[in-house]
Structure formats: structure tokens, C-alpha cells
Amino acid sequence: MSTLFLNARLLNPAENLDTVGSIKIGDDGLIEAVATGGESIPAKAEDNVIDLAGKVLAPGLFDMHCHFREPGQEYKETLETGSAAAVAGGFTGVALMPNTRPVIDSPLGVAYIRHHSAGLPIDLEVIGAMTVESRGEALAPYGKYASYSVKAVSDDGTAIQSSQIMRLAIEYAANFDLLLIQHAEDKHLTAGGIMNDGAVSAMLGLKGIPEVAEPIMIARDLQLIAWLKKHKLNGAVAEPRYHVAHISTAESVALVRKAKAAGLKVTCEVTPHHFTLTEHDLSSSIEKGNFIMKPPLASVENRDALIEGLRDGTIDAIATDHAPHAKHEKECPPDQAAFGIIGLETSLGLTITELVDKGVITLSQAIELLSTNPRRIMGLETILFRAGRKANLTIIDPDCEWIVSESDFGSKSRNTPFMGRKLKGRALGIYHNSKLIMR
């Protein structure tokens, strides 16, 4: 049975498309026809016709930074429940970080994820570890990753501390055209820290994490990349592609902005919790465990710098760093809480509420940040609204107002600081892999 979406706002930044129109999809999942500019697509009696007047059809959202905990910590999340969380948030694909148990640092680990994700409603891209067991001591087999069509490497959560190992990672990743995703953290500065270092941490009696721990690592990496580009590469290998995960400070944004101006292939992402919350939200909350994450929630000034980075295009993507934890790991004193929160179900709503509605970015730019750019950065195929192309769509109601509640989550975990928060904008469903899934 074919599916016919009528009267939707067709919004696809990759095609500079923003107009009211209709899309018909065959039962094979391929787009049969696209109508805009007052044109119409005739419906057949057997078609599944859905009127989307006032709603948006966008390219399927893609989150390039998620943790689904499988293998090894299935009590927090599984590939199946993580995928359910993604669908609830309007995502048709995500990229999975390798810090599972065991770490995904070999083709065997990649094969495990692909085998166990077969039949799930979304696409799962596997990110390989930068180093063996993410210990920062010896490089993982980048050549074998490439042969398994892995697109990126990261030691997320345990940034490479050795400059020599990082230099090798940059060179080898460039040779195999792998994106380097850096969790920028100087562990010598952050050891034992719980939240942003400053007056608020002192007031709460919690050990602080100095904000300089992030830009120090970014500056080191960018210096290495610039040096290798000038003195070592000489066209012998591809230029490194470097991506900063969950950027959180003004200085980090400034470094990325400067590197882009210098012509380096540098991109970065920000999480909804970092452009929405600050350290003061932690201090005023009773349930502080759900405000503990890395990098920590920072000052108002740093949060505002992130918003400006989104406004001027320095920040390329919005990613959730979806990090599920069990109830007992978060409902505890803050200095005992696990780092991280879930984010797939609330990402779109926070983006529209905090950025689009406040005039920081347009809805089209939001789709770029949530879909077009993450796919481009990861080296994935661009989604186009054209006949013959595979339909990969997210259905959005940008005006829907809703209160975040437990019933909204597909995730196995509930560790969010946004429970009870009023948001505007919500995914109503997805069309992907020849299947329509509506909320």
C-alpha cells in the first residue's frame, strides 16, 4: 500500500526546500512523486492518505552521539529500547559510541551491533574506539574499521591524554578517511570533579571541574592537526576531519571558530542540555543527580556563548549524548551519581523551545543541525525529496505544546532533568525502511 502525505510543509535544507506540498511513497519505500507550488498528487482508493496541514515533513533526524549500553550494561538500555527512544524523539538514525562493555574496538564488536540491530526501526551507525579498550595506549585497527564501513572513531568518555598517541590517531584516521570525534577532557584537571568549578560548586561543597579542561585538549588537537597539515601530510594522505563532541565552553567555541577560519576541517556539536541549562539549575534542583554530566553544566556566560555559536554557524550539529542510567545510579548524592542523562525524546522539543521560538535560529536551521549536518559530518547519504529516492522522513508538529512525563519515553531509563518541563514542538512519527510509525 502506498502512503500519500498531503498539504505538509516540506522542509529540507539540503535542497533549499521550504514549501507546502505533498509526497507519495510506494510500498517499496521509495518516493513516487513530490508535488509543490499548487500541484497535486491524485490519490488511489487503496492509498494510505494522511493530511499533514500545519505539520512539517523533514528529512529523518539523525543523532550522531548516543549510548545504547549494549553489550554489557543492558540493565540501563538495549539496542531495542534505545531505538524506541529514538523513534519517540523523531530520529530515524543514530550513531553509537563505542564505550560499551566490552569496548567496540574491533570488527567483531561492529559485527555484534549490526547483527543484533537487524530489524530495528532505525539505522544504527557504529563508531569504533580510537584506541584498544579506549585506554589511550595503542591504536585500534583503523584499516579493519574502514573495511567494515565504519565512518568514525572516538574514545568518548576517556579522551586520549598522550599527545603522541593522538598524533598517530589523527594520521591514521586521515589515511582511512575516518572522522575523529573527540571527547575533549584533560583528565589530570578533572579527576574527582563533579560539577563546574566555581562559586556554585564551592557553595554546594562539591569538587569542581575547571572549564579549561576542555579547551586545553581542543587546542592541543588543533595544533597537531595544523602542524601535520603543514609539515607532514603534504598531500600524501587525506586531510584530517576532526569533530568536537558536546562542546560546552566559550573558549572551546572560539577555538573551533578560529580553526574553521584557518581552513581546517573541524566541526562540533552541542547538546540540548548544554544550550538550555547552567550550573545554577543544578544548585536549585532537589534531584541533583540528573544534573550531573560530563562536560558539566557551565556558567551562564558559557551557555550564552554556545547559543551564539549556534546563531553564527560555528556549531554544526545538535546531538544528545543520550546516556541512560538506572534509577539507583542517579537518585543518590551528587558526588556518587553517574555522569550523563537521556536526551533522544526531548531533543527536538528543547531545540524548538529554546532556539527556534526565541529567534536564535529558524526551523530550517534546526533541521540542518538535527539532520542534514550530522549526516554530512558522518559521511552518510544526503536525504532528498525526489522521485526514486528512499523515503526517510520525520513528521513534526512545531506548535504542539506538551509536558515531559514518564509516558513519553521509549528508553529503559528515566534520568532526565527535564521531567515536568513544558516544551513546544514534537515529532508525530517517522517514515523509514518502508514503515510508517506514528505516535
Curated annotation (Swiss-Prot):
GO cellular component terms, alphabetically, are: cytoplasm
Residues holding Zn(2+) 1: 65, 67, 156, 321
PROSITE patterns, from UniProt?
DIHYDROOROTASE_2
Cited CDD domains:
DHOase_IIa
Q: What is its EC number?
A: 3.5.2.3
Q: Under which main EC class is this enzyme filed?
A: hydrolase
Where, by residue number, is the active site?
321
BP term (GO), one: purine nucleobase catabolic process
Q: Which InterPro entries match?
A: Amidohydro-rel, DHOase, DHOase/Allantoinase_Hydrolase, Dihydroorotase_CS, Metal-dep_hydrolase_composite, Metal_Hydrolase
Cofactor note text: Binds 2 Zn(2+) ions per subunit.
Show the catalytic activity. (S)-dihydroorotate + H2O = N-carbamoyl-L-aspartate + H(+)
Database matches in PANTHER family: ALLANTOINASE
Q: What family does this chain come from, according to its entry?
A: Belongs to the metallo-dependent hydrolases superfamily. DHOase family. Class I DHOase subfamily.
Record-given protein name? Dihydroorotase
Organism of origin is Chlorobaculum tepidum (strain ATCC 49652 / DSM 12025 / NBRC 103806 / TLS)
Classification from the root reads: Bacteria, Pseudomonadati, Chlorobiota, Chlorobiia, Chlorobiales
